[in-house]
Structure formats: structure tokens, C-alpha cells
Amino acid sequence: MRAPAFWSESGLLPGLLAPAAAAYALGSALRQAATRPVKAAVPVVCVGNAVAGGAGTTPIALSIAGLLKGMGRKPAFLSRGYGGRLGGPVAVDPALHKAGDVGDEPLLLASAAPTVVAAERPAGAALAVELGADVIVMDDGLQNPSLVKDLSLMVVDGGFGFGNGRVMPAGPLREPLHRTLDRADAAVIIGSDTTDVRRALPGGLPVLHARLAPVGSDLSHKRVLAFAGIGRPEKFFETLRAIPCDLVATHAFGDHHRYHPDEIMRLVEAAAQAQAAPVTTEKDFVRLPEDARPMVRVLKIQTEWQDSKAMEDLIARHV
């Protein structure tokens, strides 16, 4: 899904949805209370967020795994595999699995470290240990109570923050913010804090800053037709503008959108007519029909920490 515009507003519609939001929050609280967390055989680092619609957890999880490898550890990723048909636990094999099997994020994660998809996280953690992991990095799952987390990172998009501060469906929050903050060991703010995220955080909560930067791009000053089916496609479009690209058209689809071959051909033809390159995200690229991939450019990004040593020290203290 795409984040509705009213999730950033405090108008009539969020107020009308307040009863549904209260029911959602109650259901979340009951689930937390009814679940006894399981302690995995190895430490667990959870990279999650407070809102629906994406905040950049996957690139942060990839970076955390890279830092762990630099510290001599053997990380494995654990993911729910949103959008995939396999409940798992299953070890992701990019040569065998497609996004329809395991979801798009796990395919990206599997290029960096062993990756397990599991609806039941404790079973997934056990498989990750069997695969040789001495530390598990959970991509998302801050609200999932089934595993004990040794380090919980709350990732926040500095350009979106916590929206209107309301719980779904009245706003973007997965639960009342204070509950998420209670279980977070640190916050990671991605990009410029234009929504005053820092003010909403407890004074004693460690805060780290990072940005998602293009890597290996040769799109500078090129004509580009951009398309994306992610939580906040505007972030992708703004990244392209900042390169800078000449963005001739943008097409936004729902999060985890499954592309039809005809859909891609229309985009490719529109790009050709505009004398532009069709460009998408890494997450979208793995969801494209295989025959269409050679016709589409992909913009790769990486995490750049304001202070990577602070992140390494935080990891070392917890795992």
C-alpha cells in the first residue's frame, strides 16, 4: 500500500477513523501481552520502524550486517517475507526463489548474507543458526513479540517522521508511539530531520543519523522516466532529482506492486518516446518480469552513517 496523504494531516478523516485506530491499538497490545518471547541461541539485532509504509529498514539492515562482518561476526538475516507465498522457515536462494515466493526485501538481503524467511520468527531464527549465523539481523519486526531482541533499532524517515502521530488506519503508526519507544534501544534518523523527529524522542534515547546515497550511478544530467512501487516513492524520485537527473516523468505504484509485462512495456515505450532511460529501485527490480529487466535501469543505494563508529560501539555493547 501507499501511505495516504491524510496520514500526515490532523483533519476530519483521521478523527473519524479514531475508533478504528483505538481498536487496532488494543489488538496490538493484546497480541504483545499474550506472546511469550523466545530467546534465540544467538544475539538478535532488530531493525524496525514505528510506521507502516516503509522507513528504510532494509538498507539499514544491510549496513548493520556489513558492520558486523567487519567485527568478525557471521550475520544472517531474518525476514517475514512480506508479499511472498512461502511461510517458511526457508533459506532464500536468489537462483531459485522469486519475489512472489519470498518477498522482495529477502532477495536483496540474500545477496549480502544468508537469509531466512519465516512467518514464525523463532523457527526462522533456529534455521539461521543452523546455517552458521552467530548473530541474527531482523529486517522489520520491532512490533513482533515472538523473539527476544538484544538490540532494537527504530528507523525513522526524517522527511516523514511519525506522520500525524495517530495509529492505523487514522495515521501511519503501527501502535501508540510510546510503546515502540519503550522497546527501542536507539533511533536511526534517515536524511534531514525536517519533521522534528528528535523532539518526539525521549532525552536518554541514543540517536544516530544516516543517509541513503546512490552508489555507482551514471545518471547525472540524464533524462529519466522513474517508476517505483514502494512505501514512499516520492523519496526515490527526490533522490534522482538530487543526483541531479532530468526527471521527465514519474509513475508511483502501490508498495510491493507486482508488475505485469504489458505494464513494463508501456513504461519502456513511454521512456523511449521521451528519449529517457526507465529507472526503478532495487526492490522494484527484483519484482520485474525477468524478460523486462534488461530494458530497465536500477538505482542502487547504500547507507552512509554520520558516525559509523558510534553505530559499531552500540552494536558491540549489545551483541
Kindly give the residue locations of the regions a language model identified:
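A transmembrane-helix-recognition feature enriched in membrane-embedded lipid enzymes
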Residues: 1-43
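C-terminal accessory "lid"/substrate-recognition subdomains
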Residues: 2-7, 161-277
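Residue-level signal for inorganic ion chemistry
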Residues: 23, 58, 109, 139, ...
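Walker A (P-loop) phosphate-binding motif
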Residues: 29-97
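Hydrophobic residues at beta-strand termini and immediately following loops
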Residues: 47, 156, 210, 251, ...
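Conserved beta-strand elements of the Class I
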Residues: 74-78, 154, 223-227
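Phosphate/Mg2+-binding loops and adjacent switch elements
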Residues: 81-83, 87-203
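Short, flexible loop segments at boundaries between secondary-structure elements
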Residues: 254-257, 295-319
